[in-house]
Each structure stands twice: as structure tokens, then as C-alpha cells.
Swiss-Prot record:
The gene is fusA. The lineage of its organism: Bacteria, Bacillati, Bacillota, Bacilli, Bacillales. Belongs to the TRAFAC class translation factor GTPase superfamily. Classic translation factor GTPase family. EF-G/EF-2 subfamily. Its main location: cytoplasm. It comes from Geobacillus kaustophilus (strain HTA426). InterPro entries: EFG_II, EFG_III, EFG_III/V, EFG_IV, EFG_V, EFG_V-like, EFTu-like_2, G_TR_CS. SUPFAM superfamilies: EF-G C-terminal domain-like, P-loop containing nucleoside triphosphate hydrolases, Ribosomal protein S5 domain 2-like, Translation proteins. Catalyzes the GTP-dependent ribosomal translocation step during translation elongation. During this step, the ribosome changes from the pre-translocational (PRE) to the post-translocational (POST) state as the newly formed A-site-bound peptidyl-tRNA and P-site-bound deacylated tRNA move to the P and E sites, respectively. Catalyzes the coordinated movement of the two tRNA molecules, the mRNA and conformational changes in the ribosome. This is Elongation factor G. Keywords: Cytoplasm, Elongation factor, GTP-binding, Nucleotide-binding, Protein biosynthesis. One of its GO terms (molecular function) is GTPase activity. NCBIfam families: EF-G, PRK12740.1-3, PRK12740.1-5, PRK13351.1-1, small_GTP. CDD domains: EF-G, EFG_III, EFG_mtEFG1_IV, EFG_mtEFG_C, EFG_mtEFG_II. Residues 8-282 form the tr-type G domain. GO terms for cellular component: cytoplasm. GTP binds at residues 17-24, 81-85, 135-138.
Length: 692
């Protein structure tokens, strides 16, 4: 199967936006105009082609990024749909990692919204060129120039219109092209009947003004164009297009388009913009990687002749073909049925079948080429972020960085039959989503699931019910407390049972003392003259370690203490390992009264990124959660607050931050260290655990 589209005519793009800006509808229209969908699916009716999971159709939000391929004017456009909800930012990060360019969709009434800020920041991190589509021009309150202003004010983006709308709200009837200096008039509802016309008289001055502003903005980034402009020479449409393309690809300039995807206006011109201004795989720097073992840095050029290298960016479980691994091919070619090396895991994998995905149906292909996005069937060990490559030319492409989960809840199956199904479901869901974790708590035996937010875990539990038919109860979030000693003391532990027949005799003196935080348990044998025989010393240590697991205050494990066995006695006949084990555990119990035990709690290192105007509220909120502010800094137009906050106070924080900042704040947290719980709070926890 020969290559259908050259690399220069391939575009890998994502569509990113705030929730409800009309991203899915825009994607739908692109698929409709590129001839991939025969009937347009409306999100309002829950039938969009890209939203293929049941829950997405119900909630009307896009959760997983489906990858679709479409064709426009001799170009192949691969589209990755990305979610717009805060809890799903990992999906967005994943998609951005494998894209060459993106369309940012704005709502013409709101302009740049909170989640737009977040995805824009992520796209800037990955250096993704963007064009902007101001959507919903037909909506009441639509204001194109206000939306462009929010790009400058909220994102400091060098964004300039390449189009102007003719009319707005229900009067929106056409678009002015500021590059070619002509206009397009729409005659029908489906937007298929477009007429190219001269710019209407009443818009001519405005068009002229914005045409000149566009040339000035682009000329600032292009010396040749600047010279021509200053000397008053005519700048041709081709020269202007080439200069916009160059500035867009170098992420110094963002062209702004307008339209209404719902009313089918402006989508074809947006597609022209994708072809004209967004990069092909050849236009972006070659991907970097390292050779396993030697750590030597290498690059992989976007070329079919280079050795094969690809990145797995998404795992999905498909009801018909099983596990699908979505891959972005950076270099070389790959045949179905061949073997590849997963260098991240160090395992060889066989590619069973290769599928090119259209949002709701799939087409089997025999080969993929550099620059392609496809789904592979049959990979067993590959997870998100892994590199697949030619066995003879191993490379590890830089992998994706995923944030640690920030919220945990206990989950238990409703019936015995659900137990096995639940562990299978959790394993599959973890493979698909690197920010979701599941583990069994050895102390309580409960299964604990952790994720990026409350909505994230809701959807996981929901998917377990729908896709894996597992019914489960979800508990309240839990904190892993610990206990330790503050004072040193010498304590006796005596276990003697002698009432006829074989007795039990174990007797120890142990000196307990606090150890440095994080150092764990240290045991020392200081017996002189065999008062406790050597063979019983390991039993003393084991007895202490077992007893420490159950705590002395509230049933939490004891950590960071030293124990020195310095005296004791034994009986020739009645002493045994068991007796000394019990004696040691009694010594630990007795230490509770003498060593001043305290509760420890996990302290999280929290970083909150918020617009300046919310700074006071957020700092007040952190302090009310027993947090200590460690520092602040400005990052662009946002403020970053760093603080240490007890884990117990962080429950519900994602939701509270979202409402305190209208969704414009984001936060991340990682475990830092354990610290003493204040006495009044510790007393409550101890009371609760003793069931008082």
C-alpha cells in the first residue's frame, strides 16, 4: 500500500477549548465538510460522532480523545478531540504531546475562559503552534473583537484577526477574509452554498484598517516583509500567507478566525487555515530521544526512510477488538503483523492489526508511515507514554510527565461476584489512564482508588458499572496517619505462665527512644552475659515489629523509634520464641504510658496557580485549612502560591478552588513529609478510632 498523502500534506491537529465553547460541534462540522460524516451529529441530542463513550453522550462533555482522520484539498488532517474539563487535563496533555498544531476554540460571548487558560499554558509548554477559532458568532452577546482582546489580556498572546465577521448574533451572515481582501456570503442553513463577493461597502474601511494591522504585526516578525512594507511596496497575498505561516509555526503569532460551527459558517475557511498555517510533520523540529543503556541523545527525522519510532499516547478498550493502543509515528514505517521493541518497558511486542480510526468506525490498514496517527491491536505490555521502535535502532522518546493523583477514596464491591470483576476492571482502567491508581491498603484491607479529582473518580466508578458491569460502594476519603514516641524510657515486658506442665516464660527490658523523622525503626541488641539467650533475640525484634503495626494510640503504625534490648531473664525449660515475642509486644504497650506517643499526619506540598484577583481569598482559604504559606511568585499574569497543607484538610479542595476562582485556578500536590497532629485534632481522631 503506497503512501496516500505526502508528509508535507499531512496535518496532525488537536482541537482544544473550555467546556461548552463548541469544540465537539466544530469537529463534527470538519468531518461533515471533509466528507467523512453523512449526517451531522449534534451534541445537544447526544449523538456527536467524536463523543463515543456512553457517559460523554449523556453528560454532553468530551472525556476521551478519539483520533479521527479526514481529507481536505489534497491534505490528510488527523484530528484529536480533547476534553475541556479541569479533571481531564491529563487527556489534553497526552494529546498535545503528539500534535503538531492545534485549533483553540473560543466562545464569541465569553472569549478566553478558565480552562482555555489551562490548555493554552499546556500547549505553550509543548511548543504547539495554534490558530484560534472564535465560535458561536450567532449567539446573543457574540463579540468578535472582545474575544480577540481577551487573547491579549488574559494570555498575552500575539493574536491577530485574519478574518472579520459580517454582522453578529442573528445577523451573522458572512466573513471577510483579511488576507485575500474578499468576503464570503452564506445563502443557506447548511453553509454549503457560499458565494465569494467583494467586501461590502460599509465594511471596507474597517477591513482596510485590520488588513494593515495584520501586515504590521506579521512584518514585525519578518525582516524582508518589514522592508517592503516600510518602502510602501505592494505585499502579495502569497507573501503575506507565507509570512503568517512562518510566524505561526514558530509559535510567535496566532491567526484568529471566526464563524459558527452550529450554523455551519466559517468551518471550510477554518480548514483552509489548517492547511495554510499549521505545520506538517516536516515543519517541526525532529523529535529527540535517548539510546537505552548509553543515554546518548539522538533525533528521529520525520521521514519514511528513517528507523521506525512511535509514541503510544492513548490506550482504549474497544468492545469489539479489545485493547487499542493509539500511536503517533514520528519516523519510519510499520507493517501490521511485524514486531517492534517497547524500549520503555524493555519488551518485544507484536503488532496484530493496524486500524485508522474514524470517530465511530474503523478501517483496517496494512502499513503506517511517518507522521501518521493510528491504532494498533495486539500490544500486551504497552501503556501510555511508552516508545515503540525498530528493534535494531532502539530509542526512548521523551516520555510524558503525568501529575500525581490528589484524591483517594475506598471502594468495595457490592457482592462477592463483583470482587474478581472489580480487580480486572481496575487493572484495565489503570492501563488506560496513568493518573488513576488503585491499591489495597495493607492496614485496612480496603481497595483505595486515587485520581485527579472528584469528577474523575465519579466517572471511573461509572465506567466500572457500565463497561465492566461491576457494582461498587464508594466510601469517604481516608488519610494514612502514623504514630511515634516523643520521649525515651526504659520499659519492662513480662509474659509468664507457669501452672503445671510446660509453661511460658519471656522477660525483657527495652529502652525506647525517638528516632529522626523518616529514619524508620532501629533495633539494637545490648544484652551482656546471655541474660536473654541469643536465639531469642530475633523473636524480640519480630514481636516489636508486629506490635508496631497495630499502634499504641489509635491503631495506626508506629514509625521512627529506636528500641534497645538491654536486660531480661529466661527459664531453662519454659522459655520459647513465642513467649519472648509476646513479652516484647507487652513492652511496647507499656511504653504508651511512658514515652509520650503522638499522632503524625501526611503533609502535602501544594502549588496553586490563580489569577491575581483571587490571591487574598486563596491565601485565606489555605490558612483556614491549617496550611503554611511557603512562598509566592508571579508567572505570566497568574500568581503561584506554594504551601504545606495537611492531607486531611485537602479533601474537597479541587471543588472549592474551582468555585472560589470560577474554575480559573489549578493546583497540584505531592506528599512531602509527616508532621505531628495538633493535640485537639489528635484527641478527636483517637476518640473516633476507639469508638468512644
Amino acid at each position: 500500500m503506497a503512501r496516500e498523502f505526502s508528509l508535507e500534506k499531512t496535518r496532525n491537529i488537536g482541537i482544544m477549548a473550555h467546556i461548552d465553547a463548541g469544540k465537539t460541534t466544530t469537529t463534527e462540522r470538519i468531518l461533515f465538510y471533509t466528507g467523512r460524516v453523512h449526517k451531522i451529529g449534534e451534541v445537544h441530542e447526544g449523538a456527536a460522532t467524536m463523543d463515543w463513550m456512553e457517559q460523554e453522550q449523556e453528560r454532553g462533555i468530551t472525556i476521551t480523545s478519539a483520533a479521527t482522520t479526514a481529507q481536505w484539498k489534497g491534505h490528510r488532517i488527523n484530528i484529536i478531540d480533547t476534553p475541556g474539563h479541569v479533571d481531564f487535563t491529563v487527556e489534553v496533555e497526552r494529546s498535545l504531546r503528539v500534535l503538531d498544531g492545534a485549533i483553540t476554540v473560543l466562545d464569541a460571548q465569553s472569549g478566553v475562559e478558565p480552562q482555555t487558560e489551562t490548555v493554552w499554558r499546556q500547549a505553550t509548554t509543548y511548543g504547539v503552534p495554534r490558530i484560534v477559532f472564535v465560535n458561536k458568532m450567532d449567539k446573543i452577546g457574540a463579540d468578535f473583537l472582545y474575544s480577540v482582546k481577551t487573547l491579549h489580556d488574559r494570555l498575552q498572546a500575539n493574536a491577530h484577526p485574519v478574518q472579520l465577521p459580517i454582522g453578529a448574533e442573528d445577523q451573522f451572515s458572512g466573513i471577510i477574509d483579511l488576507v485575500e481582501m474578499c468576503a464570503y456570503h452564506y445563502h443557506d442553513e447548511l453553509g454549503k452554498n457560499i458565494e465569494r463577493i467583494d467586501i461590502p461597502e460599509e465594511y471596507r474601511d474597517m477591513a482596510e484598517e485590520y488588513h494593515n494591522k495584520l501586515i504590521e504585526a506579521v512584518a514585525e516578525l519578518d525582516e524582508e516583509l518589514m522592508m517592503k512594507y516600510l518602502e510602501g511596496e505592494e505585499i502579495t497575498t502569497e507573501e503575506l500567507k507565507a509570512a503568517i505561516r512562518k510566524a505561526t509555526i514558530s509559535v510567535e503569532f496566532f491567526p484568529v478566525f471566526c464563524g459558527s460551527a452550529f450554523k455551519n459558517k466559517g468551518v471550510q475557511l477554518l480548514l483552509d487555515g489548517v492547511v495554510d498555517y499549521l505545520p506538517s510533520p516536516v515543519d517541526i523540529p525532529a523529535i529527540r530521544g535517548v539510546v537505552p543503556d548509553t543515554e546518548e541523545e539522538v533525533t528521529r527525522e520525520a521521514s519514511d526512510d528513517a528507523p521506525f519510532a512511535a509514541l503510544a499516547f492513548k490506550i482504549m478498550t474497544d468492545p469489539y477488538v479489545g485493547k487499542l493502543t493509539f500511536i503517533r509515528v514520528y519516523s519510519g514505517t510499520l507493517d501490521s503483523g511485524s514486531y517492534v521493541m517497547n524500549t520503555t518497558k524493555g519488551k518485544r511486542e507484536r503488532i496484530g492489526r493496524l486500524l485508522q480510526m474514524h470517530a465511530n468506525h474503523r478501517q483496517e490498514i496494512s502499513k503506517v508511515y511517518a507522521g501518521d496517527i493510528a491504532a494498533a491491536v495486539g500490544l500486551k505490555d504497552t501503556t501510555t507514554g511508552d516508545t515503540l521502535c525498530d528493534e535494531k535502532h532502539p530509542v526512548i522518546l521523551e516520555s510524558m510527565q503525568f501529575p500525581e493523583p490528589v484524591i483517594s477514596v475506598a471502594i468495595e464491591p457490592k457482592s462477592k461476584a463483583d470482587q474478581d470483576k472489580m480487580s480486572q476492571a481496575l487493572q484495565k482502567l489503570q492501563e488506560e489512564d496513568p493518573t488513576f491508581r488503585a491499591h489495597t491498603d495493607p492496614e485496612t484491607g480496603q481497595t483505595i482508588i486515587s485520581g485527579m479529582g472528584e469528577l474523575h473518580l465519579d466517572i471511573i466508578v461509572d465506567r466500572m458499572r457500565r463497561e465492566f458491569k461491576v457494582e461498587a460502594n464508594v466510601g469517604a476519603p481516608q488519610v494514612a496517619y502514623r504514630e511515634t514516641f516523643r520521649k525515651s524510657a526504659q520499659v519492662e515486658g513480662k509474659f509468664i505462665r507457669q501452672s503445671g506442665g510446660r509453661g511460658q516464660y519471656g522477660h525483657v527490658w527495652i529502652e525506647f527512644s525517638p528516632n529522626e523523622r523518616g529514619k524508620g525503626f532501629e533495633f539494637e541488641n545490648a544484652i551482656v552475659g546471655g541474660v536473654v539467650p541469643k536465639e531469642y533475640v530475633p523473636a524480640v525484634q519480630a514481636g516489636l515489629e508486629e506490635a508496631m503495626q497495630n499502634g499504641v494510640l489509635a491503631g495506626y503504625p508506629v514509625v521512627d523509634i529506636k528500641a534497645k534490648l538491654f536486660d531480661g531473664s529466661y527459664h531453662d525449660v519454659d522459655s520459647s520464641e513465642m513467649a519472648f515475642k509476646i513479652a516484647a509486644s507487652l513492652a511496647l504497650k507499656n511504653a504508651a504510658t511512658k514515652c509520650d506517643p503522638v499522632l503524625l499526619e501526611p503533609i502535602m506540598k501544594v502549588e496553586v496557580v490563580i489569577p491575581e484577583e483571587y490571591l487574598g481569598d486563596i491565601m485565606g482559604d489555605i490558612t483556614s485549612r491549617r496550611g503554611r504559606i511557603e512562598g509566592m511568585e508571579a508567572r505570566g499574569n497568574a500568581q503561584v502560591v506554594r504551601a504545606m497543607v495537611p492531607m486531611a484538610e485537602m479533601f474537597g479542595y479541587a471543588t472549592s478552588l474551582r468555585s472560589n476562582t470560577q474554575g480559573r485556578g489549578t493546583f497540584s500536590m505531592v506528599f512531602d513529609h509527616y508532621e505531628e497532629v495538633p493535640k485537639n485534632i489528635a484527641d478527636e481522631i483517637i476518640k473516633k478510632n476507639k469508638g468512644e
